[in-house]
């Protein structure tokens, strides 16, 4: 597999950017320390997460650790500007998600020059000399509307070329797209040479059909690694009320209620089922559930190895809740 990570569970850095709420600095740093103490050695972040706040906090939390002891991934496609602005920023469907982050303005830039600038900024905020894997962030419809294909064209002709060169020169280990949609990944596979993808919410217990149609089989064939972000689908599979970064609608809630009922009848924690389902596919290099509070990372690791009876998975399949093409945990 072209995405080689030290642990199959990583730490998703979005909560460090004050996602949904203003997280105190000591709590944010403690959540990273907890992840490290639990054995997690893969950390992901992005400039979008609080306009650089997540990167600053992650860098501070990891500063005392041997850089060779962990893998780090970050994202390009956005530049954090010096000027500040108030109110809701142009963040696509995630408009108010990081309203408690830093007030700096963020600008899209998927060019080769913008990619180099974004990496330089991230290295500085993270306080490190290298980033292992770089994801081109959000060249997709949920952020760019009907113009998303044009944006992806720029990204594949600019950022992808620059990152391929960096990989060849040994500056990074690999690159791919970091998106919430399957189609941009399929196009990137046809037109470029990515090492894998970070895809959020699209290979989960709740939503996996589209990924299984082409992306997952092709990734397996080419030895690419898929990092599954949002294995709890923004929290709805972990007892929360968010799906796709907003309050879940009635159709999604009804489907989750059926999943919960089946889980209860088999004495299964639905969170464990969600993590183990995503990890069961051979193309999945890691999952990165967000952990906004100390203790969550250790809990996620416990859930990922919890015993789940085969009868539960068979019941999901029989109810049509899991695709016949989806590998199930052993």
Q: Can you describe what each PLM-predicted range is?
A:
Residues 1-83, 87-91:
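N-terminal binding-site loop/beta-alpha segment at the start of enzyme catalytic domains
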Residues 123-147:
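Active-site groove signature of glycoside hydrolases
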Residues 11, 28, 43, 58, ...:
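Conserved, mostly hydrophobic/aromatic
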